[in-house]
Amino acid sequence: MKLLIALLALVTAAIAQNGFGQGGYGGQGGFGGFGGLGGQAGFGGQIGFNGQGGVGGQVGIGQGGVHPGQGGFAGQGSPNQYQPGYGNPVGSGHFHGGNPVESGHFHGNPHEYPEHHGEHHREHHEHHGHHEHHGHHRH
């Protein structure tokens, strides 16, 4: 068992080096939006834990890949977050297979994105429409 634990520790170190937060960490959405949460290359990234899918498989938390329009598979990452010193193959924009997986940088609640708030408020306003009050006419 000790050998396995040591192996896991080594793999984890490799992940931190190669994938952890390299393409993700705010990802495409900046705000941590729909690219940061699932991250772009994220925790298992491309290399490391399990090769292709890493720790969280293909989609991670679900935000990274489910909303491609929001920066899911765009593979841009946040250029400011890329640390070139590592020289890792999973950098900002270089995703060999594009697994949006990251577990570590969760920027707030995935349900608290401004894009969604507008829709909910609009629904509420539509229901409270015109209430006509008809007076009682006394003859």
Curated annotation (Swiss-Prot):
UniProt KW keywords: Developmental protein, Secreted, Signal
Source taxon at top rank: Eukaryota
Sequence ranges of Basic and acidic residues compositional bias: 109-121
Positions of region (Disordered): 60-139
Biased composition, class Basic residues, residue ranges: 122-139
GO cellular component, one term: extracellular region
Signal peptide (UniProt feature, chain positions): 1-16
Principal location class: secreted
Subcellular location: Secreted
Annotated Gly residues bias: 60-75
Biological role: Likely to be involved in the establishment of the head.
Name of the protein in question: Protein spalt-accessory
Chain's gene name: sala
